[in-house]
Amino acid sequence: LDLGCGEGRHTLSAALTAPIHAVGLDMSRRDLTTARNRCGDFESLTKTENAPSLIEGDGARLPFADATFDRIICSEVLEHIHDYETFLREIRRVIKPGGLFAASVPSFFPEWVCWKLSDAYHEVEGGHVRIFNARALERSISNFGFERFESHRAHTLHSPYWWLRCLFWRGEQAQHPIVNLYHRLLVWDLMKKPWLTRWIDRLLNPILGKSVVFYFSTDP
């Protein structure tokens, strides 16, 4: 289950990578339509047995039976939710005994800088409602019967991009030329994966990584 799947990046990636049944759930009908259209870009995902299920729904009331999923991810979602512990309770309910859960949220320092640079960044509809403290979030998740076995920071190069977005805030309108230029760098890095940016990412992730990622297990 990819909870809060948006336009399906992780859902489709999982379906393409392994022989699994991937399920993406999101509240945005528009994002789910985009995700379905993206499935058409991959021949293997047009086959019924490989196609992911993309469902419109609320993470606070998941439309699944108890102990349904072997793996659950919730990537960059919890920071948007006022009552995020309700999401965690539902995740615990629908994950199987022995299942694995991965969650990511914005890291404290890069997110704090974004909030300082632009009020609009977090005041937009559907925007971020809190800045998580990583240890506090880990405790919250652990309180629902999960045990963390790994965590790391990621996406150092994304932090300056969002700082520039906030500094030259234009919402969803055409971005400042500097922001567009940096975005081109990110796309190039994603496609080419040069050793230099990989090295910079590994070096600076502990300090500037835009996201913190947790991996949890449950008792068998």
Over which residues does each language-model region extend?
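Short, solvent-exposed loop/helix junctions and linker helices
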Residues: I81, I131, P206-I207
